[in-house]
């Protein structure tokens, strides 16, 4: 599901695009880098973990892509400025900047150390603002360019037990909308927001877990490659909003119609889910340092949590539809 006008920005350069990707060391970032490398793209890959970045770069180079690795913590504005300078020197021009960094801390808000919540907001909101500040200045000089922000369904509907993550995603959406409005007089500069459902990437396992329970993620989890393909398509057809997964659109509508009923339902759903989940160690994950566990594109959760893609999609859509029915009934009663 996509919205916004179609343009021709980037079509002449998109054959062999020049792209910057932050958060490129695993998951969606790695999948996007590999997809672009297969098209012969010239890439600048950034993340905190040098070893994981180099592994991704090697895969991309085997596809014939030219790749520059720039270890970067996007929470540091000076580091992102340095990344932009190196990217310009290596690429010459930037067709697309993919702002993809994302971390999370799962647990009841009062149980999550406030330092962890701070770090989540700094990475997921301020980090994306640092990316945008660097990218937009390049695009204004070029008079064209595409900024892609990876947001998530959390930008439309808050996720209980992930309060800081939800705050950062709502903030990202507001920031993108404001930035897009400021750039309205520049028809060849685009700010594109991507909102996927839960993605089966290593990010979930890498994140901070203060619940004492194993976090698997609810089905139907998305293949990171599906999200990557949506990002790559933005080179040819930039759009303001890209929603991936049928549940996201349904949740967006239900939240708009009956936000209180929706929030209560989400709280009960995740509360019961965590109560039944196997026990696991409390750990800060990648919030304060790069992941220690291996990266890669996949998280391995789809094989554990889903029997078939079709069956789980039907189940998830059915659950959302049931929640929608309850929410609409509650909304109608409140209007009487």
Protein language model features and the residues they cover:
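SDR active-site lid
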Residues: 184-278
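Substrate-binding pocket helix/loop in short-chain dehydrogenase/reductase
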Residues: 108-109, 116-121
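Conserved glycine-rich cofactor-binding loop
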Residues: 25-26
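Active-site helix of classical SDR
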Residues: 132, 168
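Hydrophobic alpha-helical topogenic segments used for membrane insertion/localization
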Residues: 309-335
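Conserved glycine-rich Rossmann-like NAD(P)H-binding loop of the short-chain dehydrogenase/reductase
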Residues: 41-56
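The beta1-alpha1 cofactor-binding region of Rossmann-like NAD(H)/NADP(H)-dependent oxidoreductases
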Residues: 72-82, 114
């Amino acid at each position: 599901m996509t919205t916004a006008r179609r343009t021709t920005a980037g079509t002449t350069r998109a054959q062999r695009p020049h792209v910057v990707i932050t958060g490129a060391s695993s998951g969606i970032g790695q999948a996007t880098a590999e997809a672009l490398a297969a098209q012969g793209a010239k890439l600048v890959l950034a993340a905190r973990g040098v070893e994981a970045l180099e592994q991704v770069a090697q895969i991309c180079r085997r596809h014939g892509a030219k790749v520059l690795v720039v270890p970067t913590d996007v929470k540091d504005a000076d580091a992102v400025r340095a990344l932009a300078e190196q990217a310009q020197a290596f690429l010459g021009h930037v067709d697309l900047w993919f702002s993809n960094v994302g971390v999370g801390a799962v647990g009841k808000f009062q149980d999550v150390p406030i330092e962890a919540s701070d770090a989540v907001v700094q990475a997921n909101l301020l980090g994306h603002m640092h990316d945008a500040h660097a990218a937009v200045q390049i695009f204004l000089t070029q008079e064209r360019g595409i900024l892609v922000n990876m947001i998530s369904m959390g930008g439309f509907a808050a996720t209980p037990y992930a309060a800081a993550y939800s705050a950062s995603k709502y903030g990202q959406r507001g920031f993108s909308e404001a930035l897009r409005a400021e750039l309205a007089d520049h028809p060849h500069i685009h700010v594109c927001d991507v909102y996927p459902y839960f993605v089966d990437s290593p990010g979930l396992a890498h994140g901070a877990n203060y619940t004492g329970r194993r976090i698997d993620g609810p089905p139907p989890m998305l293949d990171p490659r599906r999200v990557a393909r949506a990002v790559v398509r933005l080179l040819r057809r930039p759009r303001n909003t890209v929603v991936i997964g049928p549940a996201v659109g349904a949740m967006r509508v239900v939240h708009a119609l009956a936000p209180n009923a929706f929030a209560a339902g989400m709280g009960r759903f995740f509360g019961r889910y965590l109560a039944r989940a196997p026990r696991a160690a409390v750990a800060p994950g990648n919030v304060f340092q790069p992941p220690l566990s291996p990266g890669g594109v996949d998280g391995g959760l789809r094989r554990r949590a889903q029997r078939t893609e079709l069956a789980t999609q039907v189940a998830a859509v059915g659950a959302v539809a049931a929640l929608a029915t309850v929410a609409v009934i509650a909304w109608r009663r409140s209007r009487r």
